[in-house]
Amino acid sequence: MSAYAELHCLSNFSFQRGASSAAELFARAARLGYRALAITDECSLAGIVRAWQAAREYRVKLLVGSEIRLEQGPKLVLLAEDLAGYQQLCRLITRGRRRADKGSYRLLREDLQPALDGVLAIWLAEPGDDDDAAWLGECFPQRLWLGVELHRGADDDARLRGLLALAARAQLPAVACGDVHMHCRGRRALQDCMTAIRNHLPVSEAGAHLFANGERHLRPLAALQGIYPEALLAETLRIAERCRFDLEQLKYQYPRELVPAGHDPASWLRRLTEKGIRRRWPDGASAKVREQIEKELKLISELGYESYFLTVQDIVGFARRQKILCQGRGSAANSAVCFALGITELDPERINLLFERFLSRERNEPPDIDVDFEHERREEVIQYVFNRYGRQRAALTAVVSTYHGAGAVRDVAKALGLPPDQVDALANCCGRWSDRAPSAERLMEAGFDPQSAVLRRVLALTGELVGFPRHLSQHPGGFVISEQPLDTLVPVENASMVERTVIQWDKDDLDAVGLLKVDVLALGMLSALRRSFDLLHELRGGERLSLASIPSEDPATYAMISRADTIGVFQIESRAQMAMLPRLRPEKFYDLVIQVAIVRPGPIQGDMVHPYLRRRNGEEPVAYPSVELEKVFERTLGVPLFQEQVMELAIVAADYSPGEADELRRSMAAWKRHGGLEHHRERLTRGMLANGYEADFAARIFEQIKGFGSYGFPESHAASFALLTYASSWLKRHEPAAFACALINSWPMGFYSPDQLLQDARRHAIQTRPVDVRHSRWDCSLEPIGQEQPAIRLGLRMIRGFREEDARRIEQARQAQSFTDVHDLGRRAGLDTRALELLADAGALRGLAGHRHKARWAIAGVEPQLPLFAEGPRIEEPAISLPLPSRGEELLSDYALLGTTLGPHPLKLLRVQLKARRCRASRELVGMEHGRPVRIAGLVVGRQRPQTASGVTFITLEDEFGMVNVVVWHDLAERQRRPFLESRLLQVEGTLESSSGVRHVIAGRLQDLTPLLTGLDVRSRDFH
């Protein structure tokens, strides 16, 4: 036998069944000389795009198929013979998946009728299963085979005879199949482990579910010849020959119904663009902008993407009609057409951007437009898309959730029978998202013997499992919308969320096969900005503030930013950003663009940050390698900071076409994962030498490009974000009460909890008023104080566990008449005992019943009343004298119920004890010189570990005077893991570092002082 085609093979997209990736399977199939390989994951095409890419790489023909089992029916392998067969297969999988909950399927006999044209079927029967033969023959006339799967079992000879006899009785051709679950025999242990995981059993108890041997791998041709009759092997090639379908045959069209009569997509897009030009530039667009728009419209028309732009414009138009704040970002911000259509907010007159980063002729790939919407109202936009286009033509893309270190080791350890306490301890040795095996030192610290055979087996299998698909989840908002039913392109299944459906491919798969998507994303800052505008309009009336009407280039705003007074400000509120601000000292909008981008892995790893700062501060001359490149790098003082600059450099210095430059960008983004950047070294060097640049300069540029790795930040993305950075900064500087109030009402979002946001507001002299049923709404609100900044009234939403519907009833009853006492409140607002107890414990009844102790006593006599007796007389009881709660009791209750306090900061109450420990307050660090040893203590506000920090973690501590940034090196974090991860009140001994107005403490020793809090519930925001 010179060739063979495997017709039944599962990849690791048959979750917890297949033990090899498509790339591993096709690489081995190529080495073994297979003619073709079918990927037949169970009721799924989730992995088929990756299989298609692997098949092209290894030059082995891909057969597209799926394994299914009918409810109370036979098991089949279905293969797509042609495009019609592929579409039938997609529809069948969709029916089975939509009928069942996420992660499962139900296919019935009637789903195979009428006949599935273009689908070949292999019946995986047992000897003697004659009953289904005639029925299956009707379902698949001339397209049905009997599959013979032999795995060197003791009964192989009898099984072969029985199956051949069944084939003869049913008048069906027989064909060899492998039921392949792994590319090589060495994966058997992993396959056994995955089977145990799938069945929630340890391997030692999973015997009935495990395969008898390791034969379900891709076997050499010689081995197959010794197992199967030649005719059965030859039949595999005949079936492979009949399967002519290739994913390249898919024809995708974007919806066209948005175009009114009398127009085609091109003319309607031009009409809307012209309308947008008049709105964006009332005095007329410049010749430069006009030229750019004409260039873009011509290319959009040439590539046939008009309907895509119209669809995105329609979605954004809906949001604006509903007063939902939104903004396009990413590469779409490079487009003047997108700005004219209202999709993006970045004026091409304001910043010079590169359209080819978004769309190019050479790249021949669809554009990708990301639009951010208010996070609290995005669901309205998502349901609009579903309703406008229907479930048949719109669905979210999937995200392939993969195994990472802690999750993988937990599943493997359970499967190998480790007791629960050891499973937890071992998982804790691994970072949640880290894929590296824990060090021997870390294992020993946790009580494990690194030389233990069982432990080594667990870690070895974990290493194989890491990176495997675990399940499909839904993309946060990536929509695929089609002119034709989506299930003719890809199977569609239910998402875990109600009223959501997802396709089985993720965003990377879409790029490979040319499907367009629009990202309907959520951004908390947009919610906060809209809430700020609402609060100010309610407070003062007049013309409503908007993003467009915020005064630009305000010196007071930039002065605040340069002081790093940016808690709550979009993109520049992290400790790393705040440490950079006094060094960079932004003075204009483009400085903010750089600030947003510079504290990123790309510039840091490419060693671009310090040269830029030195040049900006006049400590190093600004130099350019040529006059031509001065135009490229002038805006960043000769230092490449953005992806677009790398593209422009390649175009100007090495004669790349715009499309080739974008291919360089894509290679740059993927080289750490897939390699593929080296071929650009020779191309860049050759082009730069030909244009008169020095070889060492070309080499240095290439190393900087590698430094960008997968983290190079797009200028368009930074510029879009900088718009929101400036808007939020302006609000914090000029309307701090409204901004803080809006942030709290929009929480969870950002780096800081409501407690830290309120502490910051108080440091800015903003008055904060307590939760009070006589005044509080559900949301926090503003209360005027003469000409000063208004006070923030805490809302009932601050009370942990309090229901919004109860708050709405309180508001409604209060509008009719003020409450006279607790009984009146409970009766007219219809509050149950639980709601009243929460209000009492939160101090929200102080105005009706007194302090917390009195309020608790008062509600003890409130009984829910039937309507018949609602207006009856009430017996008055004599007042009871109850003691005032102590300051400590008040503090504990505040944090337990509200997560914050309007009383003294917790550390103010502990300051005497902290002084006894020789801990300095944060304000004492201001006057101290660089290099001094210090001891500090504070509440842990958050822990951050940037991707570029080589294991460094930044811990933010807060005391009654402010915040301190603490740097914890990896070794210290490992040595003192418990106080590092678990402390809520942390003492740090270390060394003060001070430079350019930035201070932080390099930790040398950590100590957990949490017991001093005596039950105080203070929560940090960690690793988000």
Swiss-Prot record:
SMART domains per UniProt: POLIIIAc
Question: Which superkingdom does the taxonomy of this entry point to?
Answer: Bacteria
| InterPro entries for this protein | DNA_pol3_alpha_NTPase_dom (IPR011708), DNA_pol3_finger (IPR040982), DnaE2 (IPR023073), DnaE2/DnaE/PolC (IPR004805), DNAPol_HHH (IPR029460), NA-bd_OB_tRNA (IPR004365), PHP_dom (IPR004013), Pol/His_phosphatase_N (IPR003141)
Give the UniProt entry's GO cellular component terms: cytoplasm
MF terms in GO = 3'-5' exonuclease activity; DNA-directed DNA polymerase activity; nucleic acid binding
Q: Name the UniProt key words of this record, in alphabetical order.
A: Cytoplasm, DNA damage, DNA repair, DNA replication, DNA-directed DNA polymerase, Nucleotidyltransferase, Transferase
**The protein's Enzyme Commission number:** 2.7.7.7
Record field: catalytic activity: DNA(n) + a 2'-deoxyribonucleoside 5'-triphosphate = DNA(n+1) + diphosphate
Nucleotidyltransferase: present as a keyword of the record?
yes
Principal subcellular localisation of the protein: cytoplasm
Q: What is this protein called?
A: Error-prone DNA polymerase
Instruction: Give the species this sequence originates from.
Output: Pseudomonas paraeruginosa (strain DSM 24068 / PA7)
